[in-house]
């Protein structure tokens, strides 16, 4: 695995040993980051179900100001720290060994600019995360990788990459109505 773009472009990162981690492929990661390119500079990012840390490290490489990584598996936490050390990213990141849903349950609204999540497929975790985000929108943008057969709540924009999909949700701006209007008036381009 490698960092695709930014200051660490071409640098190799490693996945934790074993079959428990399903790293996001380069093609999917590139498409994911391309969708977020305008929001990444100086963003505060959260990488949930972080695995190797590839998503968060890619965001940092492309200009994010800080990234918190949340991962419950000890081998993955070690891999994230090792990858961050190799890249020199330790000063602009933190790793939390914790269940992702428990972590976000304590977050206030707008704690992050961007949340990227790649939960295990077919366990309902992606949908649970979206429901938690809707209850308290802890970021402006939530992106979730999931299997194309996993049902997610409506309201996101899904892009498919083989059997994987990435769905992007945006929180309404303060004062926006649910239907996308601001103060009862349609926004330009809405």
Report each predicted region and the residues it spans:
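Class I S-adenosyl-L-methionine-dependent methyltransferase catalytic core
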Residues: 1-190
């Amino acid at each position: 695995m490698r960092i695709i773009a930014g200051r660490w472009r071409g640098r190799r990162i490693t996945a934790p040993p074993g079959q428990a981690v399903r790293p996001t492929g380069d093609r999917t990661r590139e498409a994911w980051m391309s969708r977020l390119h305008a929001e990444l500079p100086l963003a505060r990012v959260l990488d949930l179900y972080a695995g190797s840390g590839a998503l968060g490290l890619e965001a940092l490489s492309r200009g994010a100001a800080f990234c918190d990584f949340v991962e419950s598996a000890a081998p993955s936490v070690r891999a994230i720290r090792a990858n961050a050390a190799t890249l020199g990213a330790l000063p602009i990141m933190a790793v939390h060994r914790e269940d992702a849903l428990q972590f976000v349950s304590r977050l206030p609204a707008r704690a992050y600019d961007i949340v990227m999540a790649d939960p295990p497929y077919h366990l309902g975790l992606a949908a649970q995360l979206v429901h938690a985000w809707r209850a308290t929108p802890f970021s402006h943008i939530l992106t979730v990788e999931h299997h194309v057969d996993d049902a997610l709540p409506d309201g996101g924009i899904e892009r498919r990459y083989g059997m994987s999909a990435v769905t992007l949700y945006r929180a309404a701006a303060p004062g926006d109505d649910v239907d996308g209007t601001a103060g009862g008036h349609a926004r330009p381009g809405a």
